[in-house]
Amino acid sequence: METLHHPLVKMEDDYALSSDSEPNSSCMASTWDWKNNDERYSLSQTPSPQSLSPAVSYESPYSSSSHTQGLEEMPFSYSLLQYPSLCHGDNGDLTKKDHGHKPSMTVQRRRKASEREKLRMRAIAEALHTLRNNLPPMYSQGRQPLTKIQTLKCTINYISELTNLLQCSKRV
């Protein structure tokens, strides 16, 4: 990664937008000339000490010798950069890196949490059932039972009506 960072920083410096420093200049005036600058930003021209293989081999049992002669005359040798050693195991195979995952809940803790949630939901359902049973029939919608929210809203309305009745009876 270090070797990749330096050419990118250099490219960033060479091709910085000229409009940032000079407001009257065109955005990427003549500094963007990729056809003439390709030798500065080509892939590695010499084999790096970090490469896995010195050059890409195009030889196969079916290739002719004239074909390989043309490849030897190529001015560049494209090399593969070595993977960081953190991604490889002892035998060179790719391994999954540990990113500090949270330890998962044990089966026993999950069961206990599930039981607590069931009991909580059961208690809420029983309380709503009690509210529905104690509401006057005028608040029920006939055959269908009230939903949780409808039950709570009807209960609030019923309590406010009872409160108003009590306040009116105290005045008289």
Curated annotation (Swiss-Prot):
GO terms for molecular function: DNA binding; DNA-binding transcription factor activity; protein dimerization activity. One of its GO terms (biological process) is cell differentiation. Residues 1-69 are annotated as: Disordered. It comes from Xenopus tropicalis (Western clawed frog). The gene is msgn1. This is Mesogenin-1. One of its GO terms (cellular component) is nucleus. Involved in specifying the paraxial, but not dorsal, mesoderm. May regulate the expression of T-box transcription factors required for mesoderm formation and differentiation, such as brachyury T, wnt8, vegt and eomes. Residues 42-66 have a biased composition (Low complexity).
